A protein has these predicted regions:
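Conserved G1/Walker A P-loop phosphate-binding module
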Residues: 1-81, 88
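Active-site glycine-centered loops adjacent to acidic/histidine catalytic or metal-binding residues
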Residues: 55, 164, 194
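Conserved GTPase G-domain signal focused on the G5
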Residues: 2, 167-169, 173, 177, ...
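Catalytic P-loop NTPase motifs of RecA-like helicase/translocase cores
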Residues: 25, 59-61, 94, 169-170, ...
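Conserved phosphate/pyrophosphate-binding and hydrolysis machinery centered on Walker-type P-loop NTPases
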Residues: 138-142, 171, 194, 198, ...
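P-loop NTP-binding site
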Residues: 229-364
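Conserved C-terminal guanine-recognition region of P-loop GTPase G domains, centered on the G4
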Residues: 37-41, 46-47, 69-107, 112-190
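Short, structured loop/turn "capping" segments at alpha-beta junctions
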Residues: 188-189, 202, 212-220, 243, ...
């Protein structure tokens, strides 16, 4: 479990996409959690609070323009924080303990960050891009840890160490793990959690509330994220690409929503008794960008089979999000070197796009 999984568990909603691949998260994602007041003895009581969590991309040394933009997302999130959580996958740290003398799998960013590791062996045709991915993710655990803790040491706010997947780790191995990490930084709190079993989540929320300043509510009670629907739809499509393709293809893919037609408001007509209700239809067209013709061939698959698989999986998730039927049209475009194009990378940032539209006096 990484930060995206934790965010989804805390909000009770699918705010962020989650996969087993590193560097899944590319943008800052806000998740809003309402914490109810608790009465009782002084040590047990707490005020009502609204916690705004910011899920950031992974902290790693940048290798491309996309990497630099992702790291900028981290810096911008740190400018407005009251508390910072550094997540460590305890189960993976145990598995890697005999392989490398580092500080293990730590996250203040992407899900399951495993620098320089990918699933499977790349083919000769894709080996060059695979090497590029490994360079972008960093040369070693030690150097990445040094980079991460270098950022953390500059912060003037409470920093929590959150150990995840503790249900998969023997208890006698947790304390040595915590001791080793405490040597890297003096954390304000150390909180082991398991999202799968809901262990430690309430304690984590309580400790965060203790550190937060009093202030006005940022979001309405029923709002759990700040993401526009179009961005969430694009992310669900990208999630299927991450799940359904391998090697370097997911990292070279970007999704742009080209058309989003919501169903018109209809007057409810009487239905025959026992007839199922027909949900309205949302029409969506999206472009999947990649960098090479070989990647395009993989994304499309033989006879379009892979693109159909991606579309079918994404459509089900989008229908769950929107509460409507969805007609989803996908096509693939080759944009050589888009990850090193500042213009292209910035156009993928929905916050910048909203600022541009506001400056032109337009609305979404």
């Amino acid at each position: 479990m990484g930060k995206s999984t934790l965010l989804n568990a805390l909000t009770g909603e699918k705010v962020a996409i989650v996969t087993a691949k590193p560097q899944t998260t590319r943008n800052r994602i806000l998740g809003v959690v309402e914490v109810a007041a608790r009465k009782g003895k002084r040590q047990d009581a707490r005020p009502a609070a609204q916690i705004v969590f910011v899920d950031t991309p992974g902290v790693h040394k940048p290798g491309s323009q996309l990497d630099r933009r992702m790291l900028q997302e981290v810096y911008e999130a740190l400018e407005t924080r009251d508390v910072v959580l550094v997540l460590v996958d305890a189960s993976r740290r145990v598995k890697l303990g005999d392989r490398e003398q580092g500080t293990g799998d730590r996250e203040q960013g992407t899900e399951g960050q495993r620098d320089g590791e990918e699933e499977g062996e790349p083919s000769d045709r894709l080996r060059q891009d695979d090497r590029r991915e490994k360079r972008a993710k960093g040369p070693s655990w030690a150097s990445e840890d040094e980079f991460l803790f270098g950022l953390v040491r500059k912060l003037d706010c409470p920093v929590f160490l959150v150990l995840t997947k503790i249900d998969l780790v023997p208890k006698d191995q947790l304390l040595p793990m915590i001791d080793a990490l405490m040597k890297q930084h003096e954390f304000a709190e150390v909180i082991p959690v398991s999202a799968r079993k809901k262990d430690g989540l309430d304690r984590l929320l309580a400790r965060i509330v203790e550190k937060l300043p009093e202030g006005e509510r940022y979001f309405p009670k029923d709002q759990y994220t700040d993401q526009p629907t179009r961005f969430m739809v694009a992310e669900l499509i990208r999630e299927r690409i991450l799940v359904d393709t391998g090697e370097e293809v997911p990292y070279a893919a970007a999704v742009v929503i080209e058309r989003f037609e919501e169903p018109p408001a209809e007057v409810e007509r009487p239905r025959k008794k026992g007839a199922p209700q027909k949900l309205p239809l949302t029409r969506i067209a999206a472009a999947i960008y990649c960098e090479r013709e070989g990647q395009k061939a993989i994304l499309i698959g033989k006879g379009g089979s892979k693109l159909k698989e991606i579309g079918t999986g994404a459509r089900k998730q989008i229908e769950s999000l929107l509460g409507t039927r969805v007609y989803l049209e996908l096509h693939v475009i080759v944009e050589p070197g888009w990850r090193d194009s500042k213009r292209f990378v910035e156009e993928l940032d929905w916050r910048r796009e909203l600022e541009r539209l506001a400056g032109e006096g337009k609305t979404d």
